């Protein structure tokens, strides 16, 4: 039987973000800048990661508390060996209605079919430019946008439902909004543009680098005829629009200009096995990995997850100002540990 629990702000729990690795094969400046994550950077050893059995156990207990959706993140999740084994385990859990995965797309041809066969049906591909030269400068690994576009074509050809995520930074890739909308509109693929956020500690974020939803919308309306779309469910983070001529939808994620803390239903598990109630968390998360490995029962695990959710009062984006960002003393958890 599913228990209905809410946090201190009355928010239910519906989603679980599972980071399966802290490693990535890109070095995007806003997430894992090469100056910080160089060739000598020490990533987590395997024994510091949750095993797939541990993740499945955690997901099963969370399903009993109301979680219906699971998203697999990283780092780059396709760098975790035998990820299809985890997908198959998660697909067997009663109550889990949707399993998604966020990826940079580079390894889709290598692993996509195995993941599909294990039950994965939905992926988000992070792609911040459609121009090859610009994309190479963003990922710092000399990977062309055309390479990722080919991987996306492959993913759709095997039956995966693909959405594309684009983090927009002023003066960096805001000139990519129109060409990317045009390209994916013709492909009938949903694209979502995300306001640049101050996740982690190393991306040099400030308000001047943010292109807001309203600024994006003004740009888009000069080139396309669009209509707004009603939200599909409670807690949907994107504001959706529809192209009038072919009905293809796109989204704008207002993580800075119009925060959505009040409807956030996500629990997050970092790659080193810690619980976080917010993408912008500063306090060290509860060590779920150590708790599980101490020999607790599923009932004890459930009670701990309930307690963690019921004391949750995070609303970082609601409270974000230039002053709060400048005065912040404690470091946030880095994005490669907690996913997006």
From Swiss-Prot:
<keyword id="KW-0408">Iron</keyword>
<feature type="domain" description="Radical SAM core">
    <location>
        <begin position="8"/>
        <end position="227"/>
    </location>
</feature>
<comment type="similarity">
    <text>Belongs to the radical SAM superfamily. MoaA family.</text>
</comment>
<dbReference type="InterPro" id="IPR013483">
    <property type="entry name" value="MoaA"/>
</dbReference>
<dbReference type="InterPro" id="IPR000385">
    <property type="entry name" value="MoaA_NifB_PqqE_Fe-S-bd_CS"/>
</dbReference>
<dbReference type="Pfam" id="PF06463">
    <property type="entry name" value="Mob_synth_C"/>
</dbReference>
<feature type="binding site">
    <location>
        <position position="163"/>
    </location>
    <ligand>
        <name>GTP</name>
    </ligand>
</feature>
<feature type="binding site">
    <location>
        <position position="102"/>
    </location>
    <ligand>
        <name>GTP</name>
    </ligand>
</feature>
<dbReference type="InterPro" id="IPR006638">
    <property type="entry name" value="Elp3/MiaA/NifB-like_rSAM"/>
</dbReference>
<comment type="pathway">
    <text>Cofactor biosynthesis; molybdopterin biosynthesis.</text>
</comment>
<feature type="binding site">
    <location>
        <position position="71"/>
    </location>
    <ligand>
        <name>GTP</name>
    </ligand>
</feature>
<dbReference type="Pfam" id="PF04055">
    <property type="entry name" value="Radical_SAM"/>
</dbReference>
<dbReference type="InterPro" id="IPR050105">
    <property type="entry name" value="MoCo_biosynth_MoaA/MoaC"/>
</dbReference>
<keyword id="KW-0411">Iron-sulfur</keyword>
<feature type="binding site">
    <location>
        <position position="126"/>
    </location>
    <ligand>
        <name>S-adenosyl-L-methionine</name>
    </ligand>
</feature>
<keyword id="KW-0949">S-adenosyl-L-methionine</keyword>
<dbReference type="GO" id="GO:0061799">
    <property type="term" value="F:cyclic pyranopterin monophosphate synthase activity"/>
</dbReference>
<feature type="binding site">
    <location>
        <position position="31"/>
    </location>
    <ligand>
        <name>[4Fe-4S] cluster 1</name>
    </ligand>
</feature>
<feature type="binding site">
    <location>
        <position position="28"/>
    </location>
    <ligand>
        <name>[4Fe-4S] cluster 1</name>
    </ligand>
</feature>
<keyword id="KW-0004">4Fe-4S</keyword>
<dbReference type="GO" id="GO:0005525">
    <property type="term" value="F:GTP binding"/>
</dbReference>
<dbReference type="GO" id="GO:1904047">
    <property type="term" value="F:S-adenosyl-L-methionine binding"/>
</dbReference>
<comment type="function">
    <text>Catalyzes the cyclization of GTP to (8S)-3',8-cyclo-7,8-dihydroguanosine 5'-triphosphate.</text>
</comment>
<dbReference type="InterPro" id="IPR007197">
    <property type="entry name" value="rSAM"/>
</dbReference>
<dbReference type="InterPro" id="IPR010505">
    <property type="entry name" value="MoaA_twitch"/>
</dbReference>
<comment type="subunit">
    <text>Monomer and homodimer.</text>
</comment>
<dbReference type="GO" id="GO:0051539">
    <property type="term" value="F:4 iron, 4 sulfur cluster binding"/>
</dbReference>
<keyword id="KW-0547">Nucleotide-binding</keyword>
<protein>
    <recommendedName>
        <fullName>GTP 3',8-cyclase</fullName>
        <ecNumber>4.1.99.22</ecNumber>
    </recommendedName>
</protein>
<keyword id="KW-0342">GTP-binding</keyword>
<feature type="binding site">
    <location>
        <position position="30"/>
    </location>
    <ligand>
        <name>S-adenosyl-L-methionine</name>
    </ligand>
</feature>
<dbReference type="GO" id="GO:0046872">
    <property type="term" value="F:metal ion binding"/>
</dbReference>
<dbReference type="GO" id="GO:0006777">
    <property type="term" value="P:Mo-molybdopterin cofactor biosynthetic process"/>
</dbReference>
<dbReference type="InterPro" id="IPR013785">
    <property type="entry name" value="Aldolase_TIM"/>
</dbReference>
<keyword id="KW-0501">Molybdenum cofactor biosynthesis</keyword>
<feature type="binding site">
    <location>
        <begin position="266"/>
        <end position="268"/>
    </location>
    <ligand>
        <name>GTP</name>
    </ligand>
</feature>
<feature type="binding site">
    <location>
        <position position="24"/>
    </location>
    <ligand>
        <name>[4Fe-4S] cluster 1</name>
    </ligand>
</feature>
<feature type="binding site">
    <location>
        <position position="261"/>
    </location>
    <ligand>
        <name>[4Fe-4S] cluster 2</name>
    </ligand>
</feature>
<keyword id="KW-0479">Metal-binding</keyword>
<feature type="binding site">
    <location>
        <position position="264"/>
    </location>
    <ligand>
        <name>[4Fe-4S] cluster 2</name>
    </ligand>
</feature>
<keyword id="KW-0456">Lyase</keyword>
<feature type="binding site">
    <location>
        <position position="75"/>
    </location>
    <ligand>
        <name>S-adenosyl-L-methionine</name>
    </ligand>
</feature>
